[in-house]
């Protein structure tokens, strides 16, 4: 009799993906973030579902319904803060995951990499729309400012913005459709994750050396299932510490003031995980130029497979490229800091320099350093 795990049409898919999957024997903890992102997505869908049971997508009652969830619903405060801080964890792991992909040359799996970038856009869109739902001051003004950027698109811009708003300003129609999209997108993301994994399992995982590991593979279970569970344990400790001790640490105090179209907050800014892109947007004193720079700051990831000129896949044995990688990370920290600062001297010039360095490092410095390393190694 054949093993059900290997013969059942449904179970064998799970078996080939998570149990008998041949995995490189040397993958480090940097490979844990994929599974952590999966857990985060599941957690967000679950907590989001319970929040949606009590939330009302109406401008007059949205803010009150969130207050009601926190005060009157059993463990509503816990669900709400797990959802809000879960989004922060999601983005931390997402950036680690992308950083690992850049460092170890995982972007050479073109299909997996490109669907990953589309996933990033989908997650960013979901998070942005979710931030609008509590209908606080920063929700309202953030929605107004960011959607207004589309008016920079030539010819169709202004019409497009009014079409998205469902009127002449951010109002009831906007909130309702944002809730609808915020609810449906995570399920679309789940489907995209499956495609992401499908492409990954066609090639097999990369490893820290960047070399072919076909000669040294081990089954995913139990070796990496136990490793992933440990990662999830660390993640839950981090998330629950944040939720229980400082739930509002990463939020904005302005969002505890109900939305008021007649009163603009002194500094309109998005959640911390968008600040680097927001800083790049603000560093160009032209509306269309800023929007193009904003989109380019993410789309530039698609160029990594093209600008990879090194004969080695991974950065493990390329010290000069490693220095540039960490320069890029430091640069992103500077951009994140600048994105949260007011538009005044010296922050303007720092933001412009950091934005320029970001693009220059990826487009010029990294490829030219790779060529130099090839020469040094007589390749």
UniProtKB/Swiss-Prot annotation:
The keyword Metal-binding applies. It is a multi-pass membrane protein. Keywords: Electron transport, Heme, Iron, Membrane, Metal-binding, Mitochondrion, Mitochondrion inner membrane, Respiratory chain, Transmembrane, Transmembrane helix, Transport, Ubiquinone. It comes from the Eukaryota. One of its GO terms (biological process) is mitochondrial electron transport, ubiquinol to cytochrome c. Belongs to the cytochrome b family. This is Cytochrome b. It comes from Ctenomys lewisi (Lewis's tuco-tuco).
